[in-house]
Amino acid sequence: MPSFDIQSELNKHEVSNAVDQANREVATRFDFKGSGATYKYEGNSITLQAETDFQLKQMIDILQNKFAKRQIDVAHMKLEDPIIQHKSAQQTVMLLEGIDQTAAKKIIKLIKDQKLKVQAAIQGEKVRVTGKKRDDLQSVIGLLKEQEIGLPLQFDNFRD
């Protein structure tokens, strides 16, 4: 039976490259000269450090542009509240990866509401969809691309 997986994954190498490019741009921009503004990429988070809140907002914009140039969906980014002190401002950007249980249940409910002859099952941080016809699977992909789920989804592991 044909099947495919729905997942939400990040290419960590591309994220690292985007952060490096953003660091280079901040180091060479005139309005950031001598400010000590930096990005630090650790695990599933990126920490932004600058002198003012305004610089943090500019740094977020730079990071989003670098993500877009590297074909990384900016929906993977979840901005935490900034921590602003006397001469420094810091903000953490969490990188969302994988489909959590609530999002997986929402995806399965959307698929079942269409009354297509497919089965969807949660497998860890992925959702596997199986069906008898390839056309049904393609209509599920079209449906999920139209819906606003709040996560960037990738469709892979197609099998016949």
Swiss-Prot record:
Gene3D superfamilies: 3.30.70.860, YajQ-like, domain 2. GO terms for cellular component: cytosol. One of its GO terms (molecular function) is nucleotide binding. Keywords: Nucleotide-binding. NCBIfam families: PRK05412.1. Belongs to the YajQ family. PANTHER family: UPF0234 PROTEIN YAJQ. Nucleotide-binding protein. This is Nucleotide-binding protein CBU_0114.
